[in-house]
Amino acid sequence: MTHTAGRRKELESIMQGPETQSEWGDIEVRLAKADDAPAIETVLSQSFEEYKERYTSAAFKAATPPQEIILKRMEEGPTWVAEQRGEIVGTISAIPHGRTLVLRAMAVPPEERGRALGKLLLVSVARYAFRNRYRRMTISASPFLTRALREYEQFGFQRSKEGPSEFHGTPVYNMTKTL
């Protein structure tokens, strides 16, 4: 099987995945609304708090923005939330940049990890990217976010030298997934 055929098969598999809340049990991934901003702020804060000492203060502040900044980000591009029984338990956002969808702020609080929420969020974003004819997705993560890096690699992202090597003074790896 050629690389292109393999990628096409992978994308078809993603596109055939669960579409509704019931197919993912009691977890729904949906586009965020403005009134989700306070909960997204909490999820980001909870998700990155354990790494606070490893970030520069500027990077931590940028990774855990207040809801006013979250609302501005929602105007720049789509934001998704994973919701379970009315509670937001994960989030990711994206910025369109030409035919590339730049992902940012993927977060799942520690007590929610290990339940495939990250994968569910990535599947939702990949569907959006595929349906809107993006050619690739990119994401950056700091080296100490080993669980996230592993999740991205398992989802088909590959490390790339494209993009900045740091985020407000904190080192990052850049990753790309061709669609």
For each of these PLM feature ranges, what is it?
Residues 71, 135-179:
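C-terminal "cap" of GNAT-fold acetyltransferases
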